[in-house]
Amino acid sequence: MLSTKSLIVLVLIAVAALVWLPRKSVEARLLIEAPPKAVWARLTDTGNYAAWNPIFVGLSGDMRPGGELALDMKLEDGQLSQITVTVDAMSEYQIIQQSAGVPGILTAHHEWSLEPAKEGTLVVQRETYRGFGVLFYDPAYVECFMRKVLKI
């Protein structure tokens, strides 16, 4: 059996590992010639994701803070995988934040940011991955698809 001192050391090591876990991020930006309201309408229309999104070809669920969405994700090899994300935050016509994964193993935090611009809307899409799984995960294909997705 572990002593109290050993247990405290293990807990501190675990907490430190979680704080300094590996991280990778991808980002894509595009100026869309439409007002933020129109872009927002497209992003929040869960029934029509397949019409414009080459990664998430199906989406169902509750698009609101605290809601869960089931996403049919097209993988790099063309196969489909379903993942569940939680909508962490939404600010109408400005931002949608979602997250998924198992803390410590691999988590993904996804953000759509809409910024009004003279010519329309600057859409910034970011995804940050954290956890030990990052050491074995290359999100380069996600960044490539993100650039395609932004052509909404």
Where would I find each of the regions flagged by the language model?
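Glycine-rich portal/gate segments that line the openings of hydrophobic small-molecule binding cavities
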Residues: K5, L31, A50-A51, S60-H109, ...
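Hydrophobic ligand-binding cavity/cleft-lining segments
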Residues: L2-R64
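A conserved amphipathic terminal alpha-helix motif
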Residues: L2-I8, R126-I152
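Solvent-exposed, acidic/flexible segments
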Residues: I32, P36, R42, L80, ...
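Non-transmembrane interaction and regulatory regions of membrane-associated proteins
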Residues: I55-V57, I96, A108, T121, ...
